[in-house]
Amino acid sequence: MNKQGNQMSFLRTIILVSTFGGLLFGYDTGVLNGALPYMGEPDQLNLNAFTEGLVTSSLLFGAALGAVFGGRMSDFNGRRKNILFLAVIFFISTIGCTFAPNVTVMIISRFVLGIAVGGASVTVPAYLAEMSPVESRGRMVTQNELMIVSGQLLAFVFNAILGTTMGDNSHVWRFMLVIASLPALFLFFGMIRMPESPRWLVSKGRKEDALRVLKKIRDEKRAAAELQEIEFAFKKEDQLEKATFKDLSVPWVRRIVFIGLGIAIVQQITGVNSIMYYGTEILRNSGFQTEAALIGNIANGVISVLATFVGIWLLGRVGRRPMLMTGLIGTTTALLLIGIFSLVLEGSPALPYVVLSLTVTFLAFQQGAISPVTWLMLSEIFPLRLRGLGMGVTVFCLWMVNFAVSFTFPILLAAIGLSTTFFIFVGLGICSVLFVKRFLPETKGLSLEQLEENFRAYDHSGAKKDSGAEVIG
């Protein structure tokens, strides 16, 4: 019993340390919300609308590329080594952003930082999925999502604290940015002591090392059985050539890619990052003063963390499909109400409070259902040999849609107003509900190897009989 307790304790340590990649992901995507006003001052980087957009979006471009190359590097070097490498990039690029003397250095540093963010968005969920036992994989993988939203909340809180206490210091934005160097150091030194993924070790023929790792996080009998299951799955793939983009055109793999791309797009076209990146501007647009809007932005961060706790709890009890459907219906309804009330209550002192309550409601559904399911399913639907490449391609798509939404939102807001902008997202939300209902398989309760078998079986059967809870792929 004591040995089993040590195994669980070590597994929890693995989860805590590796998900600091998610914390960095969240902090670095959220911190600019409060840093930009100070950064843009004439005696600092002197940003205009164009360069401000470049500083913001350069991270997203880098993240898109980091997702693709991070997946391939993860397959080649291993999940653990890749996370160590990403921690170094996080640290160096954070220092580059902090001490940037001009906008050019800032854009380059943000781009490099984005590569680390994108790489972490692929590698950390894959590492967690491959270390977790099947019955708790959902809860453990979505710990990363919890760390992402916690990182965003920390960014909002530190921005508010530093902005309030050091607002008269023109370099306050540099203090906001440099904070991210601390979790980068923790991630690096923590991962040095963590083991490599047993599934990756088997893929490299290191079966004894894989068994040694499994015995550290499973009881001996289960470790041996799980190793056999991994070996059996790998033997089927061992006869195939090394994974390339051409492999993604194989019919049964193509279906997985289609589902993965759909999940990635669905998560972003809800408009979540229009709220996470421009939440303060949305609240100001609805009638709040700047200070009240900043406080409201912290409320958005708090509800994101609380909702993610609920989402992690639900994943162990509810299927992926019903969670995603419920989340999409909730977010689409919240956006519809924002659009309607922005028209009906235009100019009313009640409008900003209504909009704030609805953005909080939106984030409760987004972070409590949609986002946890997204990252979990992307980490579990691809077969071992294609997991790094497959996640890289789908998360590249996720980041590019993220960029498109984040880039166009302020343009739409200025051109057609708050209500019409959100009506567009309502239309996209309806399309997302239809996609999930028609195409999304259920993966709860299945091992990664069983999922692969089901996708292969779907290809041989030629048609899916039922898109409900029982799934053939």
Curated annotation (Swiss-Prot):
Keywords (A to Z) from UniProt: Cell membrane, Membrane, Transmembrane, Transmembrane helix, Transport
Compartment list: Cell membrane
Pfam families (alphabetical): Sugar_tr (PF00083)
Keyword Transmembrane helix set for record: yes
Membrane topology: Multi-pass membrane protein
Listed transmembrane segments: 14-34, 49-69, 83-103, 111-131, 146-166, 172-192, 256-276, 295-315, 325-345, 350-370, 389-409, 411-431
Cellular component annotations (GO), alphabetically ordered: membrane; plasma membrane
Broad class of where this protein is predominantly found: membrane
Pathway(s) where this gene product acts: Polyol metabolism; myo-inositol degradation into acetyl-CoA
Inducing factors: Negatively regulated by IolR. Induced by inositol.
GO molecular function: D-glucose transmembrane transporter activity
GO biological process, one term: D-glucose transmembrane transport
Keyword Nucleotidyltransferase among UniProt keywords: no
UniProt cross-references to CDD domains, sorted A to Z: MFS_XylE_like
Family note: Belongs to the major facilitator superfamily. Sugar transporter (TC 2.A.1.1) family.
Note from the entry: When iolT is inactivated, inositol uptake is almost abolished even though iolF is active.
Function: Major myo-inositol uptake transporter.
Protein's recorded name: Major myo-inositol transporter IolT
Organism: Bacillus subtilis (strain 168)
